[in-house]
């Protein structure tokens, strides 16, 4: 059976860390920022890790060749 291809949308959105966690950029910063507080905007910066159950599904179905 041939190897499964990685979903191209997933490889742009997720990164696998050295310990196997899945990192992603937080949503909610594209538009409509005027109604959010500075604290809300600041807390959306950077990346965060997916929950373990969601990370398992991402690695299994969308990034099958990741470690």
Swiss-Prot record:
Family, per entry: Belongs to the bacterial ribosomal protein bL35 family.
Enumerate the transmembrane spans: none
| Keywords assigned | Ribonucleoprotein, Ribosomal protein
User: Cross-referenced InterPro entries, in alphabetical order?
Assistant: Ribosomal_bL35, Ribosomal_bL35-like, Ribosomal_bL35_CS, Ribosomal_bL35_sf
Give the matching Pfam families. Ribosomal_L35p (PF01632)
Entry superkingdom: Bacteria
* UniProt xrefs under HAMAP family: Ribosomal_bL35 (MF_00514)
In its UniProt record, a GO molecular function of this protein is: structural constituent of ribosome
Any Gene Ontology biological process: translation
Q: Which GO terms describe its cellular component?
A: cytosolic large ribosomal subunit
Q: What is this protein called?
A: Large ribosomal subunit protein bL35
């Amino acid at each position: 059976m041939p190897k499964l291809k990685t979903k191209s949308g997933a490889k742009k959105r997720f990164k696998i860390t050295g310990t196997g966690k899945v990192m992603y950029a937080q949503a909610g910063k594209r538009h409509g920022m005027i109604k959010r507080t500075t604290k809300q905007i600041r807390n959306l910066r950077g990346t965060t890790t997916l929950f373990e159950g969601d990370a398992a599904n991402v690695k299994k179905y969308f990034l099958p060749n990741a470690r």
